[in-house]
Amino acid sequence: LYEGCTDQTRKKHTAPIDYMNTVYSKPLKSYIASELTDDAIKAHKFKLKETPQVYNTIATLLSVVYNWAKMNKIYKGDNPFYFVKRYPKVRVKVKLPDDVRDKLKDYCESKAFDYNAHFLTIVATVLYTGFRGNEIYGLRWKEPRTEEEKKKCSGWLLSGWDTPNEKGHIFLWDPKNRKEFKAYLRTPLKNLLIRLRKKLYNDPKVSWCLDSDYIFPKSRWSANYPEEHTDSYAQTFPLRKLNEEFGLRTENSKGRLKNLFTIKIGRKTFGSEVAAERGIEIASRALNHSDTQVTRDHYVVPEDSDLDFEFENKKTNVENIETHREKKKEII
């Protein structure tokens, strides 16, 4: 669970919680259902006050477990999570400036690709498809052969994706909303994937990737794991370096430097770009949202004021119709 974390982070998350003159030393997973009190939940909520949405996610998950146990008559008590309020939802509506977005796209297709092909393909994938990180990392070159292989991946390139002058698509079999999704493979991304595939055959440094079914196989330091796909931890250093190169490292309210560009912000940037060019309805469908309200709540989209417009004056067409009617009467 704490792979890649610093000792300081590990110590922080495993330390006992001193809350309201009581010390809570057990993690939530170690409680049995009947002994978890609302005070213990409040203590863990207090511990996660700097990452409120993390607490909300945990609380939602465990609340579902309690409800399931009650429905199946495994547990007869109350759901303790009903008695502890969650943190208010923070809807972050942000995107990259258009010029920065375009520069990143150009950078992915530049000479820099030859030196960091897999990472820049990941960056291009989020900017051209809006996929979430875990949807990108688990992609395969081809459809899995068995159900076991399918469960280990997020999706795959549909057959014929690399055929010249033909449309290509990416298939996600189990995205966040649990509905299968087929996304269009836009030409710049298609060309990068073809370029990446060729590189695997021509560059000895990455030829080991040919043994993997995944587009983005896992590597850790000097070790390679072709049977596994990459993850968010592997993107930490290259993301920071990319942000530094583009001057996108900014200081937050606590004086710490953070990345302005992340995979999540890349998804939001894609959604905003589609909304601006094709409308919110198309953007919502391209992002595989359940409805347009989700897109409006979490993405920078055209303002409602943009809907206040007049139709163009097309009297000429009306006059033509009237003239046609008069001529028709004369003929009759």
Task: Locate the predicted segments by residue.
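C-terminal secondary-structure termini that scaffold catalytic or DNA-interacting sites
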Residues: 152-156, 201-205, 218-222, 306-332
